[in-house]
């Protein structure tokens, strides 16, 4: 029996991947001024970054409940099981809404095996979890096997973020404006990580060379079994820096694969252009 996968735009995977693998797509929402857009459908990250550089502050919101319901109903009618791997509940209300809507849909289709997972992951870390699930689907695993494996995979995923300009986090209320101002003067680059699905500060590094060196150190401390690992790199209007980071990772660890994708407008709305994020499995 076919197991259908569903994910949302916060995976930072290209739409072409969703189409190629037949994965249901749920877009988060982004607002600029009084206009609302669907992430990766009616707006893209480069448009968001241009607006941010012009002083605008985009806002994000969870996926539309009706959109979620429409996607769930689409799979309910097939009679096959479906698994929605959701963006971290610590960063969006989409998971909670999806659980509520899944219960409504299952009342209408009581035999429909629909499951919703809180990935507690973000950006391409979340994307790596979806890729892992897609591989399991191709291998013919049951929905129970896929759900168990994905939960375990997500619990082992490291997310290390850094932003180029603290101003954007300050605009969104993530840090104080004073911290952003002082950080900019001193060329301070913050490192952040995910803890229980939330983005939290890790360290502050002065200068890009030291920053990259520290990221490699953290990967050495936390990662393992690199020859069997796919490492993810997300970037925001800074592909050159992401490529430099990729070369350092290749030289230090020689992982099985490194994938790079631009950050989506939903994630980028908070972190801003210049964001760089690394994802890998911990020991």
From Swiss-Prot:
Keywords: Lipid-binding. Signal peptide: none annotated. Hexadecanoate binds at residues 60, 92. A fatty acid binds at residues 60, 92. It comes from the Bacteria. Residues 3-282 form the DegV domain. InterPro entries: DegV, DegV_C, DegV_domain_contain. Disulfide bonds: none annotated. Coiled coil: none annotated. GO terms for molecular function: lipid binding. The keyword Chloroplast does not apply. May bind long-chain fatty acids, such as palmitate, and may play a role in lipid transport or fatty acid metabolism. This is DegV domain-containing protein YitS. The gene is yitS.
């Amino acid at each position: 029996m076919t197991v259908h996968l569903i994910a949302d735009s916060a995976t930072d995977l290209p739409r072409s991947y969703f189409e190629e693998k037949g994965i249901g797509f749920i877009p988060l929402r982004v607002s600029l001024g009084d206009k609302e857009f669907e992430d990766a459908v009616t707006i893209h990250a480069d448009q968001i970054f241009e607006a941010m550089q012009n002083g605008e502050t985009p806002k994000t919101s969870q996926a539309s409940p009706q959109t979620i319901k429409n996607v769930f109903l689409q799979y309910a009618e097939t009679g096959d099981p479906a698994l929605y791997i959701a963006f971290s509940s610590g960063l969006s209300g989409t998971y909670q809404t999806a659980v509520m809507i899944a219960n409504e849909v299952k009342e209408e289709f009581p035999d429909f095996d629909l499951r919703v997972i809180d990935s507690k992951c973000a950006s391409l870390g979340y994307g790596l979890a979806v890729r892992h699930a897609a591989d399991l689907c191709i291998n013919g695993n049951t929905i129970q096997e896929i759900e168990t494996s994905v939960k375990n995979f997500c619990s082992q995923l490291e997310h290390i973020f850094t932003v180029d300009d603290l101003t954007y986090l300050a605009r969104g209320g993530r840090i104080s404006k004073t911290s952003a101002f002082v950080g900019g003067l001193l060329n301070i680059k913050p490192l952040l990580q995910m803890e229980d699905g939330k983005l939290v500060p890790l360290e502050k590094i002065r200068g890009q060379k030291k920053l990259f060196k520290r990221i490699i150190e953290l990967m050495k401390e936390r990662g393992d079994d690199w020859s069997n690992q796919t490492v993810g790199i997300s970037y925001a209007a800074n592909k050159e820096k992401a490529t430099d980071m990729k070369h350092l990772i290749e030289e230090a660890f020689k992982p099985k694969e490194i994938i790079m994708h631009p950050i989506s407008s939903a994630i980028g709305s908070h972190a801003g252009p210049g964001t760089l994020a690394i994802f890998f499995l911990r020991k």
